[in-house]
């Protein structure tokens, strides 16, 4: 369910950041760039039609959630984050790291420029189902090239315990050493790179 939690946080939070914060969240430490914020605001207002379909969806859905529900969905999603974090923490008490495909499917060709809006958005957001939960829980994660499936590169995501980024990096490095260098385009063309079995 962590992906669904992320979905609400990303849409409501993303809409607020894009529409009200002009590219910035509020109450964050660090420097702000007022010129950039003003530029972002003017360009967003003048050229909203140039935004990608995915950005438009996030902006409209999030704005709707904030204005009609007063941010309650965002608050509920934020309140569920500790449960998602605890579920992964439980698994990580049994294992040093969790390993999964970076994408939930083998990458496909980019959609054509004239593809319908629903297909474009589905393809864009479908890729992040395995990575987005850790954007919410804050677990350190790393994607490393894992090989090829039917000639298409695939990634392996390694996720570890909070504040144990070093283990995630060590496991990633060990896998890279064991697997060998990722094939160059010439190697891929000659089909000399090791192939993985599709899952």
UniProtKB/Swiss-Prot annotation:
UniProt name for this protein: Uncharacterized protein in nthA 5'region
Molecular function GO terms recorded: catalytic activity
Taxonomic placement: Bacteria, Bacillati, Actinomycetota, Actinomycetes, Mycobacteriales
InterPro entries cross-referenced by the UniProt entry: Amidase, Amidase_dom, AS_sf
């Amino acid at each position: 369910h962590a992906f669904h939690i992320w979905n609400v946080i990303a849409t409501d939070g993303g809409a607020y950041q894009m529409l009200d914060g002009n590219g910035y969240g509020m109450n964050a430490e660090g420097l702000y760039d007022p010129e950039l914020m003003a530029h972002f605001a003017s360009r967003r207002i003048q050229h909203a039609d140039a935004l990608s379909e995915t950005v438009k969806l996030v902006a409209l859905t999030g704005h709707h959630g904030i204005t009609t529900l007063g941010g309650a969905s965002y608050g509920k999603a934020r309140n569920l984050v500790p449960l998602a974090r605890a579920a992964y923490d439980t698994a990580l008490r049994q294992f040093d790291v969790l390993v999964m495909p970076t994408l939930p499917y083998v990458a496909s060709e980019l959609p054509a420029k004239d593809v319908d809006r629903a297909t474009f958005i589905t393809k864009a957001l479908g890729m992040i189902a395995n990575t987005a939960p850790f954007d919410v829980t804050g677990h350190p994660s790393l994607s490393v090239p894992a090989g090829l499936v039917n000639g298409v590169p695939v990634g392996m995501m390694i996720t570890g315990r909070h504040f144990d980024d070093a283990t995630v990096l060590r496991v990633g490095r060990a896998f890279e050493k064991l697997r060998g260098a990722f094939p160059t385009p010439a190697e891929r063309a000659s089909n000399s790179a090791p192939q993985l079995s599709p899952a």
